[in-house]
């Protein structure tokens, strides 16, 4: 009799344990409400962030937060998936603090390449946005580079540009995942 009870207990423990494990292995995206953002994956210094929708595939973006020397978040650099046109094949939005000197533009320098300047398009409560259109050559630089420097100028300290490091570690894999999504 005791053997039968033991067998039944082992059976139910195994079944219940398997069920509990299956319940705890649900992905982050399955637990997100419609309209909420979730992190789908990390690629080196980049993260693939998506918004839960009713669509078959949730829209995503590849992003990285740039921090100053004291570790505070300063800039959000976001790569977007969009339909390429004649010369621009990729795009990015870069959000800087509201106190950025807009006339100085956003400057991006990849490795030893010449720096490129981008005008700010608009400002919102969360910050000022520069939109970057990338050509095939530009995108190749991001994929082949190790790091880039993003330079913004604080409005209250125009003689002290702030240089922030943009890691390109994981960019190629992250961008491939963005496009494949």
Locations of the language-model features?
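Positively charged n-region of N-terminal signal peptides that target proteins for export
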Residues: 1-5
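Bacterial N-terminal signal peptides
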Residues: 7-17
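A generic "folded-domain core" signal
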Residues: 22-181
């Amino acid at each position: 009799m005791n053997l039968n009870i033991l067998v039944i207990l082992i059976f139910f423990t195994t079944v219940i344990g398997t069920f509990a494990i299956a319940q705890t292995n649900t992905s982050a995206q399955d637990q997100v409400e419609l309209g909420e953002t979730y992190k789908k994956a990390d690629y080196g210094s980049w993260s693939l962030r998506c918004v839960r929708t009713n669509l078959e595939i949730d829209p995503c973006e590849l992003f990285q937060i740039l921090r100053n020397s004291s570790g505070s978040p300063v800039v959000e650099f976001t790569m977007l998936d969009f339909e390429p046109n004649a010369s621009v094949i990729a795009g990015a939005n870069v959000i800087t603090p509201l106190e950025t000197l807009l006339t100085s533009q956003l400057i991006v320098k990849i490795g030893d390449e010449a720096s490129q300047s981008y005008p700010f398009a608009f400002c919102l409560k969360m910050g000022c946005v520069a939109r970057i259109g990338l050509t095939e050559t530009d995108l190749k630089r991001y994929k082949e580079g190790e790091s880039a420097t993003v330079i913004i100028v604080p409005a209250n300290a125009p003689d002290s540009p702030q240089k922030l490091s943009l890691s390109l570690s994981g960019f190629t894999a992250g961008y491939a995942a963005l496009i494949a999504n």
